[in-house]
């Protein structure tokens, strides 16, 4: 199926940013989640954390203003907001493990209906050798949100009944933000939050191949 209205990466990031509450401490993972820093709503204060040791991270700098000594965990140039700080990697992990992060936003290869997720290996040759800080965030953050495309390049759903890749965290994902829909997940399974225009609840169930509880006011 070809969806003309599917969200690009910037639109997914904007959708995530809409749900972040005022005053939240938020970790943005490597890859797609880093774009959330560029779409935070005006008028609220959100403190962004980066695993490599930044608190008070700002959006991407303008072209020509990059400082390559100031990068996020994905090695992308960022800015530092007033009051921001750099610190040791060990201090960063103490924040992550100690329950001080309200929300972590991570990418994933698979998320199960119960909120189990896999985001570090598909078993391919040359893949990264270990899980990294995502494991610490999955355990330490108060909520884990995932950003990803809903389908693989071959059309398989990344939302699954049970993960088949090496796991990152157990029953910790609460929201799944994709190019076609937003879902909540947990002990009661999947629930629809919204979809892109033109995608019906029935179409989404057919794509994912799993039961999805309807939302009271889902966008279609």
Where do the language-model regions lie?
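Conserved phosphate- and dinucleotide-binding cores of soluble alpha/beta proteins
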Residues: 2-11, 62-220
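N-terminal active-site beta-alpha-beta segment that forms phosphate/nucleotide-binding
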Residues: 1-81
């Amino acid at each position: 199926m070809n969806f003309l209205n599917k969200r690009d990466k910037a639109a997914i990031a904007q959708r995530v940013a809409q749900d972040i509450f005022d005053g939240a401490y938020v970790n943005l993972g490597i890859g797609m989640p880093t774009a959330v820093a560029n779409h935070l709503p005006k008028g609220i204060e959100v403190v962004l954390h980066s695993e490599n040791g930044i608190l008070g991270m700002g959006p991407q700098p303008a072209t020509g203003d990059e400082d390559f000594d100031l990068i996020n965990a994905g090695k992308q140039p960022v800015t530092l907001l007033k009051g921001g700080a750099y610190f040791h990697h060990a201090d960063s992990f103490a924040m992550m493990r100690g329950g001080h992060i309200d929300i972590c936003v991570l990418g994933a290869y698979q998320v199960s209906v119960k909120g189990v997720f896999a985001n570090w290996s598909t078993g391919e040759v040359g893949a990264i050798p270990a899980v990294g800080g995502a494991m610490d965030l999955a355990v330490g953050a108060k909520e884990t949100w995932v950003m990803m495309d809903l389908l693989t390049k071959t059309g398989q759903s990344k939302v699954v009944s049970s993960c088949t890749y090496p796991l990152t965290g157990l029953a910790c994902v609460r929201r799944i933000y994709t190019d076609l829909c937003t879902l909540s997940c947990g002990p009661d399974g999947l629930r629809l939050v919204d979809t892109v225009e033109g995608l019906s609840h029935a179409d989404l169930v057919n794509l994912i191949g799993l039961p999805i509880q309807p939302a009271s006011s889902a966008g279609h």
